[in-house]
């Protein structure tokens, strides 16, 4: 459930005040497909491409990035569905991708033999749609029938269609096949002929955040509109979701009503009725066999004990439902440690924790009424990712390991065993032998120590004026920034002589819920202060200088870089802001923005707009101030963060006389790009822009 919580967090990722809606001269740019708005976008696009694509070395940069992004030597993580292992794969010949499968024995071989199940490029051509893969949910245990998620252009809204993995065809709706129209929704299998569905059921069925309010139980062959209601959320809630765990003999079906981004109610679906889990609203629960795991986001005093925020507790499920509150503690946080994820297998739970931004892995088993743990080997300054191969139907799992300078490896492991099989390893996309990684700390405005990693030339002092350096950060939604290998970063920046810096800001999850909560709402400036402190520390150490320091961030990180631009422009030589938020006066009225009120606050409330207005980039940019040159990027098909945030910020900055470039992809959703070639173009423009500004 922790992983699902993270995925959900990545998915969801007018009273008084300045610049009220009627005073905004660029509201017309909020019309995503408006003729005037798109004409403006095309004009900006052309100017940006003309400015950057003629740069000396730009073609070579793009080709180098293409070698990385289109390389057949990439990891192919798989999911076991029935007896087969499935993987989704894109390459130069299949830009939209192949859904394919193989056997476990073949997957473990040096050269797996894959069978294509669905060719998305062929489907897109046949149906005249720019389909982007969104995943598959298959009916256990055979996984013959699957619900495939397909989006137009890569947005969060998608269609859901039943697919037969034996025949390789979609199940005809006329023959009783399940299909849901485009919406930000989904469904989970209850049995072969029943789904729990959350989707757009018509007027009034979606929340202010744009997510479903209703969960219905839909029987095959019956009209969707007549499906009986299971749960209904409020109009101001974030939305409802359903999950299914398919452990043999103990399958569970969970339904969640999310009242805010980090709080909600969870229910078990049992014999057609809902049983509420009596947990704290901001805690998340995960069934594991006959046990229930509960992860806390705030302190909980219960059963005569006080459990700290960030703890992971365990108890027998039926005992908990009967009122029992005597928990066993699997993890309790310390000032320097936090739980990053827990993964449930058939007979064990894997805990991934972070100690001062260094990851540790342990395995927990419940035997004879007690939980017992053992440590598993892991790296130091690296990144780990754990994925159950077949959910709770198996003890096998995939472990991905990498660090800034070591290409990622994909390993097959099994609970209870130390031996791991290395399945695949990325090639070295750049020469890392001349680089070194160091962890440093900056001191923020209020005295808080802020850790950051730096990837720099090995054994070489900085030149006069410092290295051309790129500072990346995020600082929100309890999402951790971890060291990891990126061929794109290596080829596009490090191999060009650049230094890379990754900051671990308050608002993130590196030190658990308290680290996140320290930068919520009225404390949001702390995250910005942390970022600025890292920039100042880099300059003070002589690693770089303002004219050679660039910053980059996406989504909330785009807000971060935009705030840094308007608050401390003298610190930076270039800014890249990707799919950003900028208009914090109207963010909650644009697409999924209302779901983020818990993170930022509600600008409709004067007392909350008072602090939001102090940092909202769109309302704080000024004419007559020297700003570094900026590149904004976005996507027309981003239905999570509205492209108007980038569009309007660019228009305002340009009107104020600042040098700003803008590039908007026509598809790609919040990721910004849907195909390999689109990714090549996006990253070539971004790194080419940074090189032009910082390496002259």
Regions flagged by a language model, labelled:
Residues 489, 502-696:
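Active-site-proximal cap/loop segments of hydrolase catalytic domains
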Residues 114, 165-180, 222-234, 269-277, ...:
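Blade-edge beta-strand/turn elements of extracellular beta-propeller
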Residues 39-138, 149, 238-258, 262-296, ...:
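Non-catalytic accessory segments flanking enzyme active sites
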Residues 100-103, 161-166, 212-221, 267-271, ...:
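Beta-propeller blade signature
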Residues 113-114, 118-135, 146-150, 155-194, ...:
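Asp-box/WD-like beta-propeller blade repeats and closely related beta-sheet repeat scaffolds
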Residues 212-258:
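Polar, glycine-rich mid-to-C-terminal structural blocks
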Residues 121-142, 150-157, 169, 174-176, ...:
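Cap/lid segment of the alpha/beta-hydrolase catalytic domain
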Residues 151-152, 199-213, 296-307, 479:
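Short, conserved, GDST-rich strand-edge loop motifs in beta-rich repeat architectures
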